[in-house]
């Protein structure tokens, strides 16, 4: 990656999605993790629910209800599916380029916003909050997950739910488990695309046990709705009343 131009962490992904929208052709985003793992993401994954997580995506859409917030919406693949199913959906992403792509694809309500800092008076309340394509990873750490779940409570109507998918890294001794205290923490991730390298950011790979521990401590009820053979899972968090 030597010689690449440094940009905001989300800029390479946003640029790749915008290029895909303009050309109709998939673009490749290079990903490097701090544990040494590197791989490529194809922009096509952000444009269609068909693919590796199709079963979880379709289940999440079926389980959605009422007014929906699509957090970390990317190119809007879930928002568009929800719109087609006649849901009222608000899509947010921290990347202005991603929001531009969503608007270009026909997402009716897409905003540049940070899910950690949403104003209930501005955005209103929701019956369902989605974190799909493992976007719950933006929490960055278990501490960040606690902070996120606390910040989301005022945004949920009574009886509301959070639907999220995630997956653990391989095994209990994966690099994101601190050997000193057992706390699951984030992996630093860097995106690169066509000569630009984003700033590194922390991403949380969240196993079911860690999610259950944090959710239970904060008074959320956890239900795992579905799993894939590869270990990804779809879960529902329900807000405890009283």
Regions found by a protein language model. Name each.
Residues 95-96:
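Conserved SAM/SAH-binding beta-strand->alpha-helix loop
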Residues 126-146:
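A short SAM/SAH-binding and catalytic strip from SAM-dependent methyltransferases
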Residues 220-242:
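Core SAM-dependent methyltransferase catalytic element
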Residues 72-76:
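Class I SAM-dependent methyltransferase "Motif I" SAM/SAH-binding loop
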Residues 43, 47-67:
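Conserved alpha-helix/loop element of class I SAM-dependent methyltransferases that forms part
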Residues 144-158:
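A short glycine-rich, Lys/Arg-flanked "PGG" loop and its adjoining helix->strand segment in the class I
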Residues 7, 11, 15-21, 31, ...:
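SAM-dependent methyltransferase
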């Amino acid at each position: 990656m030597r010689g690449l131009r440094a940009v905001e962490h989300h800029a390479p992904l946003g640029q790749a999605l915008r290029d895909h929208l303009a050309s109709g052709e998939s673009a490749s985003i290079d990903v490097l993790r701090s544990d040494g793992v590197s791989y490529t993401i194809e922009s096509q994954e952000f444009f269609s629910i068909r693919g590796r997580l199709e079963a979880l995506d379709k289940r999440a859409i079926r389980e959605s209800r009422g007014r929906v917030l699509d957090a970390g919406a990317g190119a809007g693949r879930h928002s568009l599916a929800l719109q087609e199913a006649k849901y009222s959906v608000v899509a947010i992403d921290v990347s202005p380029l991603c929001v531009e792509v969503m608007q270009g694809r026909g997402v009716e309500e897409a905003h540049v916003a940070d899910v950690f800092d949403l104003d209930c008076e501005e955005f209103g309340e929701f019956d369902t909050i989605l974190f799909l394509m493992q976007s719950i990873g933006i929490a960055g750490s278990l501490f960040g997950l606690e902070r996120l779940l606390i910040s989301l409570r005022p945004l949920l109507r009574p009886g509301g739910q959070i639907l999220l998918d995630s997956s653990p890294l391989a095994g209990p001794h994966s690099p994101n488990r601190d050997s000193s205290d057992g706390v699951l923490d984030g992996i630093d991730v860097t995106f690169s695309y066509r000569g630009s390298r984003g700033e590194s950011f922390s991403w949380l790979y969240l196993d079911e046990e860690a999610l259950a521990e944090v959710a239970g401590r904060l008074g959320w009820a956890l239900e795992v709705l579905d799993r894939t053979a590869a270990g990804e899972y779809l879960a529902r968090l329900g807000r405890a009343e009283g």
